[in-house]
């Protein structure tokens, strides 16, 4: 009987969505400059980079359009040093390489 209880507990532990090994900490902050990309980050030329390199630099896009090979990111554009105006960065790919950056 005790073996069945131990086996049952082990099965519940193994098949539950909880994990002891994975311990992620998510930090939420109200600082917009840290939450969004800043336009200063785009002074570098990203043309010719692969999708994997762009994901390594910017992280996963908020939306990726697989039919048109476009990644979309939200960026922060400061206006006269006061506040943050949200803009959308569109990164276009041709043959898995960056062909164009568009900020709207």
From Swiss-Prot:
GO CC, alphabetical: cell outer membrane
Keywords assigned by UniProt, alphabetized: Cell outer membrane, Lipoprotein, Membrane, Palmitate, Signal
Taxonomic superkingdom: Bacteria
Residue positions bearing lipid (S-diacylglycerol cysteine): 18
Subcellular location, principal: membrane
Signal peptide coordinates: 1-17
Membrane topology: Lipid-anchor
Assembly, per entry: Part of the Bam complex.
Family according to the record: Belongs to the BamE family.
Main function: Part of the outer membrane protein assembly complex, which is involved in assembly and insertion of beta-barrel proteins into the outer membrane.
Official protein name in the record: Outer membrane protein assembly factor BamE
Gene source species: Buchnera aphidicola subsp. Schizaphis graminum (strain Sg)
Native organism taxonomy: Bacteria, Pseudomonadati, Pseudomonadota, Gammaproteobacteria, Enterobacterales
Gene: bamE
């Amino acid at each position: 009987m005790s073996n069945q209880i131990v086996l049952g507990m082990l099965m519940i532990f193994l098949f539950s969505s909880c994990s002891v090994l994975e311990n992620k900490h998510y930090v939420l902050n109200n600082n917009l400059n840290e939450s969004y990309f800043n336009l200063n980050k785009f002074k570098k030329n990203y043309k010719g980079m692969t999708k994997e390199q762009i994901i390594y630099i910017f992280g996963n896009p908020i939306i990726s359009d697989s039919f048109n090979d476009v990644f979309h990111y939200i960026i922060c554009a400061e206006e006269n040093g006061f506040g943050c105006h949200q803009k959308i960065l569109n990164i276009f790919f041709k043959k898995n390489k960056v062909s164009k950056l568009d900020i709207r």
